[in-house]
Amino acid sequence: MPSQSRSRDRYGRDSDRDRSRVQPRRRYHVSEDDDDDDDFDDNPRDRRYRRDGYRRAPVDSRAYDSHDDYEVVDVEEEPRRYRSDTERRRERARASPGTSPRKRERTRDSGGGHRRRRTEESDGSQAPQAHRDRRSRTRRDRGLDDEDLEDAARRLRRRERERERERRAETSKHKSTDSSNSSAGLLNANALAKLRAQHEELDRQEQRRAEKEAKAERKRRRKRPAVEGQMRTLDPFPDEVPRGQSKGRIVSGAYLEEGRAPDMEVRLRGGGRGPPRERRWEKDSDGSAPLTPFWKRKKWWWIGAIVLVIVVIIIVVAVVVSNNKKSDSDSDSDSNSGSSDSWGGDKSSLNGLDHDSIPKSAQGTVLDPWTWYETTDFNVTYTDETVGGLSVMGLNSTWDDSVAPNENVPPLNKPFPYGSQPIRGVNIGGLLSLEPFITPSLFEGYSSDVVDEYTLTTKLGDNAARKLEEHYATFITEQDFADMAEAGIDHVRIPFSYWAVNPREDEPYVAKISWRYLLRVIEYCRKYGLRVNLDPHGMPGSQNGMNHSGRQGSIRWLNGDDGDTYAQRSLEFHEKISKFFAQDRYKNIITIYGLINEPYMLSLDVEKVLNWTVTAAELVQKNGITAKIAFHDGFLNLSKWKTMLKNGPSNLLLDTHQYTIYNVAQIVLNHTAKVNFVCNDWVGMIGEINSTSEGWGPTICGEFTQADTDCAKNLNNVGRGTRWEGTYSEGDSTMYCPTAEQRTCSCTEANADPSEYSDDYKLFLKTYAEAQMYAFEQAQGWFYWTWHTESAPQWSYKTGWKNGFMPAKAYNPDYKCGDDIPSFGNLPEYY
């Protein structure tokens, strides 16, 4: 445990502090007979005081000093003795076994340094004076007065005397022949080894402390003014600042930046004696915290500025979006606007109505007329009434079935004479069930992956509903139905798909909007006396894997692991629509009720398809459907149907679709041969299948075309080539046309604008269409595919009718099979 004298020295309270400040320089020598080692303290914590208050001189020994008697030598009066005694002490310290080799080397070097310094002093060098000047500046810089310095010097001298006495005591013990001393040396060997280790650890700690204090001292010096004497001021800023240099930045020393120069002229940019920087530097002035470099502070300023800009942008965007939503809401609620925004057609029927008449729960849904593309010919009075789970919103409460399309057909409220009078009808394909070749514009501008309604609506995402509703409202209008009646048409086949009624939430199709347009189309047919054939064109899972089923690719309806699930969903679809169309308002107009379009029975299990057909027919009849039930031949040879479903439900119609362009044996026939083929082959085939005794029974042709090439864009799927020009299959350039051997087959003329068609070409097209009409009228009649297209004129009944290559009246053709085939003049065979 430290003695009280050491404690007083540690805290600077020794009585020597009161002595006179003018004293001769003295050194204290320990008596030679002092060998007291009771002062040894092996506890490092008790010795820690030796380095808390000051740094040890490099020549100090780590041995402990004694507090026994010592003699005083006046170094000014006896300098020679002082020097000789000092040298002898250093020699004894080097020879002491308690001194480490590294310590001996340092002592030797240090002693040499002292000798060199004394030599320089004796030679009258200026080094001592310079040394004193440096010490004076250091004392002044640290704020130490003379009294503190003298006090520190006394403590330093006392420590040196005590250490020297301990070294002499250790040396005396090891040199003595006295047994007690020898045994004490042996007994204390472990203590000496431990002492050496402690000395080395203290050396390392002192070195680290010295480095730390030196670093702190350098930092303090950087913060002190570099200019002494005459005060300096900053130069004024130039009128023109060099390019790239900041006008507001001041580069100066720490003294000027602190603003303590009385004559300093400085612009305020954080400089001067401003509180923020002053507090920062006052904290740093004691070495307790490093000064953050300017570039790091600048970096944080930049980060803060960027974060602020981002926050501002987010706020602005949020405000704009909020305002847009509010604007849309305000527009929707404007009862006198007649429309929700600039999108859409005629909404004049909303004029004078209050949007609040629509319940909040229905606003923004398919039941809200303010969200519709147009309100033309819709009843906009809100109702949540449903039939079969399907909404009647948009329907008028009254109807008129007294209209006939022409004088040859009875009005709607009179039975149509099926079997004795042929059906002359058209399809409105591509309206409610999209097909890429009918409306290629809807599929343009995308990658080849957009090939059907499924992929198109997936691509359109949230925009799909608006895009498709605009198509529903504009592709075929009321005028089209008026034209149909004018052209002698009496039936309309309406393709639509299951997503008009019950799509799944995970399917991308536009749900239920097409249902409202289906109801409007039926009302247009009613208005012009046109009877309706309902055609479910796309069914859950796809019944044929073709693009017009909604999803091109795999057949999952009645096929695969989920085949039965999809079949059940299709029955649920019929459960709903059969109940709805069993209402009295539809009994006169919907005279043919289709079950499913073109199930691909060449791949499907025929027995499963037949069983499903029976189940579906019985279901819809049970729900009140009295119309004829149409089912498709599944692409099977018609002769196979002579024995299938003969004993099925009553009132069934077999639906067959006949095209020559998909049969490579028929597409290669020349113009005249094609007319002959229809009259010679199809007339007999259709007549036979329509007979209950020789064929199946009542048969209709639900689809056919006058086109004798497959040249229409996207007809064979999006982006695929044609058989006609030999581009249908990759790696196979075989052409299928009458001039294939000459390789002159061309699609250019067939795809040209109808105004460019020659009279001979128009005559052929008209004759070819009328021959097919005649063949199908040998059964129950026909439905042309289709009424309207964007750019495939030979597939558009309307285009042919308006351009002279369809009969002016469907019921009054110019050609019948059995008539002489007219001459087509010089019509080339390559188109």
From Swiss-Prot:
Active site, per annotation: E598, E703
InterPro entries: Glyco_hydro_5 (IPR001547), Glycoside_hydrolase_SF (IPR017853), Glycosyl_hydrolase_5 (IPR050386)
The keyword Transcription regulation belongs to this UniProt entry's keyword annotation: no
Biased composition (Basic and acidic residues): 1-21, 42-70, 78-94, 151-177, 197-216, 275-286
Keywords assigned by UniProt, alphabetized: Carbohydrate metabolism, Cell membrane, Cell wall biogenesis/degradation, Glycoprotein, Glycosidase, Hydrolase, Membrane, Polysaccharide degradation, Signal-anchor, Transmembrane, Transmembrane helix
Glycosylation sites: N379, N396, N547, N611, N637, N670, N690
EC number(s) reported in the record: 3.2.1.58
Location of the protein in the cell: Cell membrane
Cytoplasmic topological intervals: 1-300
Coiled coil start-end: none
Ranges for region Disordered: 1-246, 261-288, 325-360
Disulfide bonds: none
Membrane topology: Single-pass type II membrane protein
SUPFAM superfamilies given in the database record: (Trans)glycosidases
Acidic residues: compositionally biased ranges: 32-41
UniProt-listed Pfam families: Cellulase
GO BP term, example: glucan catabolic process
GO cellular component labels: plasma membrane
Biased composition (Low complexity): 178-195, 334-350
Catalytic reactions of this protein: Successive hydrolysis of beta-D-glucose units from the non-reducing ends of (1->3)-beta-D-glucans, releasing alpha-glucose
Family in the record: Belongs to the glycosyl hydrolase 5 (cellulase A) family.
Protein name as annotated: Glucan 1,3-beta-glucosidase D
